[in-house]
């Protein structure tokens, strides 16, 4: 009998060992208690098509090399269980990623039965209820709950999770004061609480969160001033307090945040004056200080600040000229200086800018164009320079224009629409920092802003499924399209007869859905101004109309005294920004109707007709008096029968 060589024997032994290991690994299972926990969690979340088993980790083979739910794309549907199978040759659940499933249940307290769990991601579902206090006993690293229907306050027990690095609960309906205990989360790096209903002042204990890198508190109802203690967040990279309810001034301590690359502050409450913070020697992606009541001049050092995406200083009280050094900012994707008091000459480098908005300022009248490439110059000159009522850049093109009594606009529509015999003009041009005046039209549109955090550049919206509209009246075709804007949207009418006008604004929310999915949970709010007067604050289309896809017409009276009318819509930082996707927020308008209440001023022909009629009546009266006196043959007037006046009186009585 042939003997097996040592080499072959070793090879067979190695193969046998590998086969044994493979069999053992393939049979690695979840402990029964974790299986039961998953089954209970699935029931609480409202998952009907998932029955977890001991082979749950093996069924998801290949995913156990992933370490976090963040490794998936933002727009992906997720139903992922990540396991760690290297602990005592037994698998344990470490991550639950249940994203974009429209789950209708509640947050599961049963998570405490998964002792190795590090992350729970339930973003963009339809979950309701409160955040379980029981979660405070877990050793979680990441909690992500954005885009649901969660209510109630943040339980103070959450602050017991000393391992927590990220807590995301944006775009829910949470309320109440932030618990001071949150200051105990000393390991936390991300705290995202935007788009809720939180109130009260920010707890002073938050100063202890020195590891914070990203904090977002926008779209809430906080009170008090922006706290000075933010200067203690020395590792901070992103600060977002857009429309937060907090008041100014902007703390000077922001200059100490050397790692800051994303600063967004807008629409501060109160009337406190802010100075321009020192942001020199920084490299920033976003610098947004909008409507913060900032006084003073533009700072030269901004020209050396590396700003890559957006510089937005709109709607402040900035004065003086644009510094020549700002030519270095032409590489910034978007620059918005709208609505300030800037003066001097429009910079010569404007033609090199990627996208620049200088509308509504006090620049010298050395420019006759409202749009120069991608530069919006509408109303960029001082109104004191032009007393005609027409903004300077339109003055020459509409000089001597015939007066009209109405304006009708199919906002965002690519074609005109005829409704009840009235034509609504098309308004379909797209883009940011946009000014557009259609040919032979007596109106223009100006829009300001860029949708943040997405590579989207649009200013119109369309409804693909017109069956979603519940409007069946004659105006329904006006609601298939709309014009939208990230910040400010202005319609400007000119060549109008002076007088009182009825302004009708047509709205229908067409970017959210009317169902039980996360896409229905968006909230859109914006201000409406007519002739500079605020007529609607935080206007919510769906709420006013009684639901998504329902039309509503808001009517107002406006006085036109200089042949012009201005209708402006402004986003003050309120409402969700991630539902149904990022970039859905800000003003939306479907159609505009402006009509003279008196049916218009009297035409020249009508005036001639009226004058002629008056002259004839006067002649008749004079002749009648003369005849009555006997100068026209009436020698015995009492006996000569009825006069012309009597016939006239008799004729009136017979009617």
Residue ranges and their predicted role:
Residues 1-482, 535, 540, 568-579, ...:
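Plant-biased, solvent-exposed loop and capping regions
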Residues 115, 507-509, 520-524:
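Folded extracytoplasmic luminal domains of secretory or organellar precursors
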Residues 496-513:
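A short tyrosine-centered beta-strand micro-motif
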Residues 542-581:
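Short, surface-exposed tryptophan/glycine-enriched loops
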């Amino acid at each position: 009998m042939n003997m097996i060589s040592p080499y072959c024997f070793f090879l067979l032994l190695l193969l046998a060992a590998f086969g044994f290991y493979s069999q053992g690994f393939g049979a690695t299972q979840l402990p029964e208690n974790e299986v039961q926990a998953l089954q209970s969690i699935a029931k609480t979340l409202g998952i009907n098509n998932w029955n977890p088993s001991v082979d749950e980790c093996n069924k998801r083979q290949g995913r156990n090399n992933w370490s976090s739910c963040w490794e998936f794309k933002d727009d992906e549907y997720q139903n992922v269980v990540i396991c760690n199978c290297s602990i005592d040759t037994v698998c344990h659940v470490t991550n639950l990623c249940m994203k974009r499933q429209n789950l209708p249940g509640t947050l599961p307290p049963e998570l405490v039965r998964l002792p190795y769990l590090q992350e729970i991601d339930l973003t963009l579902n339809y979950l309701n209820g409160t955040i379980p206090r029981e979660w405070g006993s877990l050793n979680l690293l990441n909690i992500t709950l954005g885009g649901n229907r969660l209510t109630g306050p943040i339980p103070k027990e959450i602050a017991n999770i000393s391992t927590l690095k990220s807590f995301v609960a944006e775009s829910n309906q949470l309320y109440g004061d932030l618990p001071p205990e949150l200051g105990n989360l000393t390991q936390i790096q991300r705290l995202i609480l935007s788009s809720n209903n939180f109130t009260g002042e920010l707890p002073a204990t938050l100063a202890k969160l020195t590891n914070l890198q990203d904090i977002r508190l926008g779209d809430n109802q906080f009170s008090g001033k922006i706290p000075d203690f933010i200067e203690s967040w020395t590792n901070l990279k992103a600060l977002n307090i857009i429309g937060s309810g907090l008041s100014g001034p902007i703390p000077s301590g922001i200059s100490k945040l050397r790692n800051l690359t994303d600063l967004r502050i807008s629409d501060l409450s109160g009337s406190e004056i802010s100075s321009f913070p020192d942001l020199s020697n920084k490299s920033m992606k976003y610098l947004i200080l909008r409507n913060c009541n900032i006084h003073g001049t533009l700072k030269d050092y901004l020209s050396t600040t590396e700003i890559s995406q957006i510089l937005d200083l709109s709607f402040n009280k900035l004065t003086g000229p644009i510094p020549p050094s700002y030519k270095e900012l032409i590489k910034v994707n978007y620059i918005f200086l709208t609505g300030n008091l800037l003066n001097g000459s429009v910079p010569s480098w404007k033609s090199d800018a990627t996208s620049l908005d200088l509308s509504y300022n006090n620049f010298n009248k050395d420019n006759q164009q409202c749009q120069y490439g991608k530069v919006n110059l509408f109303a960029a000159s001082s109104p004191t320079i032009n007393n005609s009522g027409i903004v300077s850049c339109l003055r020459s093109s509409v000089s001597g224009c015939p007066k009209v009594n109405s304006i009708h606009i199919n906002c965002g529509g690519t074609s005109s629409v005829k409704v009840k015999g009235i034509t609504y003009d098309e308004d379909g041009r797209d883009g940011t920092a946009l000014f557009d005046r259609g040919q032979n039209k007596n109106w223009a549109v100006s829009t300001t802003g860029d949708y943040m955090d997405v590579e989207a550049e649009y200013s119109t919206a369309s409804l693909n499924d017109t069956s979603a509209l519940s409007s069946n009246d004659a105006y329904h075709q006006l609601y298939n399209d709309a014009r939208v804007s990230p910040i400010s949207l202005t319609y400007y009418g000119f060549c109008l007869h002076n007088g009182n006008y009825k302004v009708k604004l047509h709205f229908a929310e067409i970017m959210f859905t009317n169902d039980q999915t996360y896409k229905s949970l968006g909230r859109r709010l914006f201000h409406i101004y007519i002739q500079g007067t605020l007529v609607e604050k935080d206007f919510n289309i769906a709420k006013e109309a009684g639901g998504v896809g329902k039309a509503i017409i808001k009517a107002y009276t406006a006085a036109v005294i200089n042949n012009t009318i201005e209708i402006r819509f402004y986003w003050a930082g309120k409402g969700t920004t991630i539902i149904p996707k990022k970039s859905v927020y800000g003003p939306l308008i479907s159609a505009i109707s402006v009509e003279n209440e008196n049916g218009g001023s009297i035409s020249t022909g009508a005036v001639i007709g009226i004058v002629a009629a008056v002259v004839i009546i006067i002649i008749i009266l004079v002749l009648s008096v003369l005849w009555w006196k006997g100068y026209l043959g009436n020698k015995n007037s009492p006996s000569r029968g009825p006069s012309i006046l009597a016939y006239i009186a008799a004729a009136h009585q017979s009617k």
